[in-house]
């Protein structure tokens, strides 16, 4: 059986926000300072909005750390991860500069991005990094050039596949150099495999859509701060992260073996104060006006929690692309016939067996090449069902003296609120077994 808790690493969504808050506190964030949620921040034509703005064009107004944690206000976390109040344009005046590495160093301290050491096969998860972003963009460019090879390259260059792949590797390596558009054009001409009238177009695509995007940007900081982007952690890691938080940012290790012992912590006084501030903010999530208040109303123990939803990209695949396009081609690309698509797919598989080993990929490429419309992958998949998001809830209880850390992730959970009842039942059962009512 596949052990989902140990092996499936996915985005944590807003459950990562306590890490961002810890990093900001360590740099000098005043948790009582209220910052204005202005709805969204526009960067390079892209909107980075709070969910409230995205859903209803409303904002949370002024929020401090407790309010931002309670309402899961993205805008606030964009601010504190950047050390800037974007609504007013004023610096937050931190004692130390906050960077992406500051946030990631706290994530590492809490056990994210490394194996827990549990007595099972497990994934190490993924911490975002600039090099990881570069690798991802290089792969995307490679996939684009391979898929569109007949559009960009001379026919003669495509015949010798080994030589073609060597030249493709050269293209990708240029991303590691700070080349001007003119320099890229010159290099493409020197290699001599690109269609002459496509050289400038390809050079612009490589530079502006890929090479210039490889360094970390402000947008990456925004995504990093709210648990989106390249974050990927297992449920076990998230439970370990909560346990470390409840232990003053100290990791005690995870094990399947039940054992007794006392909780130990060598955390500094400043770290303990920062952790206490974070747990207080997380307790607001289950308190009056918090998103989980209805679920925990009347619960016998105080609970510090954070919910999160991470979107899984892509679509639920049909049995085969052939059957899918046979059914929907007339709506997706009415200017071509299904028989033309099949014929073109067969040609692609015969001509490029190294690239099109399966019919599904060839069918998709055939539709894109034959249609006169400027179709995208999104257009091709428009009649497929999307995956629902991953639903997360992480928690500590009792909040004033944590004894248990819980992390629940539901695949296709859709909403984080679907994971929270599971957390409630686990904490309640554990508290009952340990007779917390006599202690707290």
State each model region's role.
Residues 1-14, 22-404, 408:
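Beta-lactam-recognizing serine transpeptidase/beta-lactamase-like catalytic domain environment
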Residues 262-266, 424-440:
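Short, gly/Ser/Thr-rich active-site loops of penicillin-recognizing serine hydrolases
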Residues 401, 411-430:
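Amphipathic oligomerization regions
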């Amino acid at each position: 059986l596949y052990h989902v808790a140990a092996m499936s690493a996915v985005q944590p969504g807003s459950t990562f926000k306590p890490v961002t808050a810890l990093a900001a506190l360590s740099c000098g964030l005043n948790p009582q300072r209220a910052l204005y949620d202005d709805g969204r921040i526009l960067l390079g034509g892209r909107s980075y909005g709070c969910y409230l703005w995205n859903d209803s064009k409303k904002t949370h107004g002024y929020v401090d750390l407790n309010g931002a944690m309670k309402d899961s206000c993205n805008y606030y976390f964009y601010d504190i991860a950047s050390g800037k109040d974007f609504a007013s344009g004023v610096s937050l005046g931190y004692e130390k500069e906050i960077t992406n590495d500051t946030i990631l160093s706290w994530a590492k301290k809490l056990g994210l991005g490394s194996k827990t050491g549990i007595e099972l096969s497990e994934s190490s998860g993924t911490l975002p990094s600039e090099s990881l972003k570069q690798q991802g963009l290089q792969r995307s460019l490679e996939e684009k050039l391979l898929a569109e090879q007949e559009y960009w390259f001379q026919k003669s260059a495509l015949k010798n596949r080994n030589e073609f792949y060597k030249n493709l590797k050269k293209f990708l390596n240029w991303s590691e150099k700070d080349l001007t558009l003119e320099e890229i054009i010159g290099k493409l001409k020197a290699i001599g495999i690109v269609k002459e009238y496509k050289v400038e177009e390809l050079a612009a695509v490589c530079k502006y859509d890929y090479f210039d995007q490889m360094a970390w940007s402000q947008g990456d900081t925004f995504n990093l701060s709210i648990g989106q982007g390249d974050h990927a952690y297992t449920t076990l890691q998230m439970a370990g992260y909560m346990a470390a938080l409840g232990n003053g940012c100290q990791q005690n290790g995870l094990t399947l073996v039940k054992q007794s012992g006392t909780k130990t912590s060598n955390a500094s006084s400043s770290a303990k104060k920062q952790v206490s501030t974070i747990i207080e903010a997380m307790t607001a999530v289950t308190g009056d006006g918090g998103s989980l208040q209805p679920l925990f109303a009347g619960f016998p123990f105080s609970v510090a929690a954070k919910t999160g939803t991470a979107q899984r990209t892509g679509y639920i695949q049909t049995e085969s692309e052939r059957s899918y396009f046979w059914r929907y081609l007339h709506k997706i690309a009415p200017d071509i016939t299904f028989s033309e698509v099949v014929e073109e797919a067969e040609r692609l598989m015969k001509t490029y067996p190294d690239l099109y080993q399966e019919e599904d990929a060839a069918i998709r490429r055939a539709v894109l090449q034959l249609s006169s419309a400027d179709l995208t992958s999104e257009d091709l998949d428009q009649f497929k069902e999307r995956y629902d998001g991953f639903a997360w809830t992480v928690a500590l209880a009792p909040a004033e003296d944590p004894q248990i850390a819980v992390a629940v992730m539901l695949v296709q959970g859709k909403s984080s609120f679907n994971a929270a009842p599971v957390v409630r039942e686990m904490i309640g059962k554990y508290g009952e077994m340990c007779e917390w009512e006599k202690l707290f």
